[in-house]
Regions:
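Conserved catalytic-core motifs of GNAT/GCN5-like acyltransferases
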Residues: 62, 107, 125-139, 268-279
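Conserved GNAT acetyl-CoA-binding A-motif
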Residues: 96-110, 118, 243-253
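Amide-forming acyltransferase catalytic core, primarily the GNAT-like/NAT-type
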Residues: 123-215
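Conserved beta-strand in the GNAT
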Residues: 47, 53-61, 69, 74, ...
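Active-site rim helix/loop that mediates acceptor-substrate recognition in acyltransferases
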Residues: 13, 20-59, 167-198
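A conserved beta-turn-beta hairpin within the catalytic core of GNAT-like acetyltransferases
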Residues: 62-70, 80, 210-221, 269-272
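Conserved acetyl-CoA-binding loop-helix of GNAT-fold acetyltransferases
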Residues: 75, 81-94, 117, 121, ...
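Conserved active-site alpha-helix within GNAT-family acetyltransferase domains
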Residues: 86, 110-128, 254-270
């Protein structure tokens, strides 16, 4: 059996989608993003072949904090357990390292123990756990309360509030966008401030952005942290500002006291995930 990893091509779509379309009960997002991923200059897709037949794939995305994000790993059910996912991961690390990247991250569902074992084999370690919450059924956006949009001149204040928040520590200092995690470095926060994506209420800080995939459009609270009362008020002021969003997600690190406040407001957990990381210096 000959196994090989190579860059993805347009012709790989049909054989890969033949099994990917059945993943997650037919709700896998890969079919809706394949064409865009293939064209994306900020990322690279790879395919693993067995005897010349594409049976798996993954993608590397380069993020604004200088890290590489690994996503979209899929292997045909008939070929699992043969080291193909590890081949894809190791190839992605070599590819990213050759471009000077020293930090690699990925995520997996909190209950996907098989994936966690595979991830540990390529020497990634768990750094944080997150849950994603949604407003209650029948939610009607009614933004209210005090929220101040922070600007480029507020960098030092915002960095101080971020670093002092329990959520920053619990969440390994990252924010989420398009379901990828990047470090809230000064450079990244400077960009978010320039976008108008950073908000404050009291000592709480939130990052809010829009996301879209295929025909879907959603609102993301990419980061929320600070005292519970301030954070709750900030969420009341921010969630629902994007009137075009069909879904709204709030990313919160597990063990954050904000979670209890969300539940009291009727928010429900959509899913939970584990953040994994590997650094070049770690081997």
């Amino acid at each position: 059996m000959e196994k090989k990893v190579r860059p993805a091509r347009g012709a790989d779509k049909a054989p890969l989608m033949s099994f990917i379309k059945e993943v997650w009960g037919g709700h896998d997002y890969i079919p809706s993003v394949w064409d865009r991923w293939l064209r994306d200059r900020h990322g690279k897709m790879f395919v693993v072949e067995v005897d010349g037949i594409p049976v798996g794939m993954n993608r590397v995305r380069f993020l604004g904090d200088g890290s590489a994000w690994f996503e979209g790993a899929r292997v045909h059910p008939a070929f699992r357990g043969r080291g193909l996912a590890s081949m894809l991961g190791e190839n992605s690390m070599r590819f990213a390292a050759a471009k000077g990247v020293g930090v690699f991250r990925l995520t997996s569902g909190s209950r996907n123990r098989a994936a966690h074992r595979q991830i540990s084999r390529i020497l990634f370690r768990e750094t944080a756990r997150f849950s994603v919450y949604e407003p209650p059924r029948g939610f009607r956006p009614r933004p209210a309360g005090a929220a101040t949009r922070m600007g480029p001149g507020d960098l030092l204040t915002v960095m101080g509030l971020l670093r002092g928040a329990e959520e920053f520590r619990l969440g390994s200092g990252v924010f989420w966008h398009y379901f990828a995690a990047a470090s809230l470095t000064e450079r990244v926060v400077t960009g978010l401030l320039a976008e108008g994506a950073v908000w404050r209420s009291g000592d709480a800080v939130a990052v809010v952005k829009a996301g879209d995939e295929g025909e879907g459009h959603w609102e993301e609270v990419c980061y929320i942290g600070g005292p519970v009362s301030d954070s709750t008020g900030l969420l009341k002021a921010l969630v629902g500002r994007d009137k075009n969003a069909s879904e709204r997600f709030v990313f919160v690190p597990q063990r954050s006291p904000i979670i209890s406040a969300l539940r009291k407001e009727g928010y429900g957990r959509n899913f939970s995930m584990v953040l994994f990381e590997r650094r070049v210096a770690n081997g």
